[in-house]
């Protein structure tokens, strides 16, 4: 299951994104929608999305400001900017904040959204797998280290005899 946050002050854009993702991925996704930068930050804290599609210009906090706040506590969320603004300064700031993609509106082909979404989902899966593998290694070390330590102590005692 992927938790996806959609943030845009344009209701039609939110509904379009939600429809594209929901019809393509169905029950694989839990999708939440917000319309302000502040709501992005609050939803990031309570919903813990894996992936966020964020517009830059929203009421209150901008998308960039919201991402800055989120990055203070969460560097793992995959963020995709979707905006009508293609100014270099915005793109540069987005890259500095670690966004995965910077898409400009209007997006005329839903395949672009689906490709970006699948790429983000793949990254989430890879991160989950890495976390799982790391935990397995730690669990094994918790078992092996005491065995090695006791074997070392035993061999030290044997050498002294």
Segments and roles (model prediction):
Residues 4, 47-53:
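Active-site beta3 strand of CheY-like receiver
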Residues 8, 55:
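Active-site residues of response regulator receiver
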Residues 11-32:
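Two-component/phosphorelay signaling modules centered on CheY-like receiver
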Residues 18, 33-43, 62-66:
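Helix N-cap/capping motif at the beta->alpha junctions
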Residues 25-35, 43, 91:
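Short hydrophobic/Thr-rich beta-strand motif most characteristic of the beta2 strand and flanking loop
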Residues 58:
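Receiver (REC) domain active-site loop signature in two-component systems and cognate sites
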Residues 95, 99-161:
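Interdomain helical linkers/hinges and coiled-coil/dimerization scaffolds
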